[in-house]
């Protein structure tokens, strides 16, 4: 059976853009915190909430920069998430069930354990249970950004495994947003969204390969979903699933594969503009009135504990169990301590956790601020501990050989089956 070749630079380009974007996101988050607690604070919050557009949705009210970022630009971010998910399942590292097994197991543990920890911590507090999904998310840009600071100390196999787990995690987050955080529905708008989505699927079936019709459909679908009451970012994922994908050996910009072209084009915009803007608009927390004791309030404590304790516990324990039971194999060239470090890094939930927090407590600004405090605290603890573990973890005995083999496959052949073989022991 002939091997399937992939763009030789795609994986490296992805890791490089995510790593650089993660570093920028860290800087922007720190900047937002500084501005929100400086003499510029009033201007910062006023700028975010000044009316800059009409009322597109009765639920949202007049559009503001904050809403344009969270409900429009983030729809583009979710479009990219959807493209990544589809590519991985059709033409990437999740093509076969054998390849999907360990990432799915890890992501399951990484979503269930944080939610259970959150519910346990907040069990005695009323009105907080809807925040159970906040610590279940992983911020791939932040995590890869931390790994970038470690350079070659982190095996390539672990970096690729992290991206795969995060993509599966994103799938779960999308389902949660669609099912758990949708209130009242407007039937006519939802029907219009279904018709638009059906038309986009029909274009795919008819062999339409130009991107313009799909992008137009995405905009129309976004508006219909926004009006319907379902969160508008879901439109991005749904639209992505209709974009055709065609294997394009060695040619990520080939016109034969609209999905590869669109994903390749959106990555820098997402990594260097959309996600940093989201971070700047949402990470700014005024610490006035907060104290160290505020971290012990049920909501921030539950979120921080879910991210810092639940994530590492859920991911590492299920990976360990899967390997010991012979269900899957540990990424080649890595040690158990490095796998633990990766599990800790997955507790960086920044972007997606902040996003879910605002959906969970949309009617309570005070709880949103508490949720932000918990997300930032849990993410910071996870980032610092994950960095230290990976920084001082000794390399595996076969690390150099595995790294050489994996690099050769990625840079020269790009053969997905060969790469996956090298990534497993």
Swiss-Prot record:
Gene3D superfamilies: Na+/H+ antiporter like domain
Membrane-spanning residues: 20-40, 65-85, 102-122, 131-151, 160-180, 183-203, 218-238, 272-292, 303-323, 342-362, 373-393
Annotated membrane topology: Multi-pass membrane protein
Protein origin, superkingdom: Bacteria
Cysteine disulfide partners in this protein: none
GO biological process, one term: regulation of pH
GO molecular function: sodium:proton antiporter activity
Name assigned to this protein: Na(+)/H(+) antiporter NhaA 1
Name of the encoding gene: nhaA1
